A protein has these predicted regions:
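Polyanion-binding surfaces on beta-sheet-dominated domains and ring/shell assemblies
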Residues: 1-164
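Amphipathic, non-membrane alpha-helical rod segments
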Residues: 167-169
């Protein structure tokens, strides 16, 4: 695979339009109140296209008697050099995670750290593509209820390439 080269603002505009289309068509984002939050697979796709690979450097069990808790540290590597880093925690006390097994809590800590590392490194590209810069996996506690009418407007706006930050025209 040939890596994407970004040297000018026009390169970024073209690349962000391409990734917006791909991420939308492949449902690699979550809509929260009319704003698109990209899942870590979308962040990884864009990072990979730029030659950036996440490496989990540490996964630390910081649990206590009542809480399963993991902290993960991830580095982004490009051409053998560290170009970014993300640190994240997940616990089984979070909304929606009380039934998670230990491995799932550990896995989510890694997923969040990967998303955070990419957000720091390429969040500006995702913003140009019309998405929010917070990875979707960090938005677990947000109420994602959207009315059917508003969801239809959001989908139409994304399809037309005329999306706004709040999903309105």
């Amino acid at each position: 695979m040939e890596l994407v080269k970004i040297e000018t603002v026009d390169d970024v505009k073209k690349f962000s339009a391409e990734i917006k289309k791909y991420i939308f068509e492949n449902k690699m984002f979550m809509d929260i109140h009319g704003k698109g939050y990209i899942f870590v697979d979308g962040w990884s796709l864009v990072g990979g296209m730029l030659g950036v690979t996440p490496i989990v450097r540490e996964l630390e069990n910081i649990s206590d008697e009542t809480t399963i808790r993991y902290r993960s540290t991830v580095e982004l590597i490009k051409d053998g050099q560290t170009v970014g880093m993300g640190i994240a925690i997940c616990t089984n006390k979070e909304k929606g995670k009380t039934a998670f097994d230990e491995y799932a809590v550990a896995s989510m800590a890694q997923t969040r750290a990967i998303g955070k590392a990419y957000r720091i490194y390429i969040g500006w590209i995702m913003k140009m593509a019309g998405f929010q810069t917070t990875p979707a996996e960090e938005m677990d506690s947000v109420d994602t209820t959207v009315s059917p009418e508003k969801l239809k407007k959001i989908v139409e706006a994304y399809q037309d390439g005329n999306d706004t930050s709040d999903g309105t025209e």
